[in-house]
Amino acid sequence: MTQEDTYKTITDLAEGIYTEKRSKFIAIAIPVRTLEEVKQHLEVYQKKYYDARHVCYAYMLGHERLNFRANDNGEPSGTAGKPILGQINSNELTDILIIVVRYFGGIKLGTSGLIVAYKAAAAEAIAAATIIEKTVDDDIYFAFEYPFMNDVMRIVKEEEPEILEQSYDMDCLMRLRIRRSMMPKLRARLEKVDSLRFIEEEEETFES
């Protein structure tokens, strides 16, 4: 499998707990798709744990893993958000938000202690989650004349794309979705069908 059209994420919310010198770290791993979802979840958990000393987090979005952020929420710089993000990266995850809530136990942990604790808490949440691999899919839209229906359907049957849309008349229309790495072969086969022409649209990418 190629790396460019697959990515790993989690299926459902998962929690983990880590305790160090009476400080309690509650980690919540949440599947997200957009920055708006991230903001909504942060608002919910900041209200839920209003009495906590710190509510730190990190997130990663998109199959290319280019949209990310780490937040220390008042902890010394680089001691909370960065180790949380480090766990996301080491597990090669995306479309994920990890929030770690800290209840201070009265004993300071120091910079290195905080890094270890936030890293461990995030790791606990990830360990409790179900990780799945998904594919990045692309669409193709085309028209062809009805007499060539059998040729098209033979290709569809053999290449097994998802049929999103189809209409049959003298001029038939069809929209298919298939994993990105398999699109070149599908398109090349369709190009050989007499009368078939592709309808170019603004490119869209779908994370299945």
Regions found by a protein language model. Name each.
Residues I28, V55-Y57, D95-I99, D139-Y141:
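Structural motif
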Residues I163-S167, K192-S208:
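Conserved short beta-strand edge segments in small beta-sheet-based binding/regulatory domains
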Residues V152-E158, K185-D194:
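Short amphipathic alpha-helices in soluble, non-transmembrane regions
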Residues A143-P161:
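Short amphipathic alpha-helix segments
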Residues A80-A128:
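Active-site beta-strand/loop microenvironment that shapes enzyme catalytic pockets
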Residues M1-G78, I199-S208:
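C-terminal regulatory domains involved in ligand/effector binding and gene-expression control
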Residues L176, M182-K185:
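Terminal, non-globular segments
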Residues I131-Y146, L176:
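Short glycine-/aliphatic-rich beta-strand segments at the starts of folded cytosolic domains
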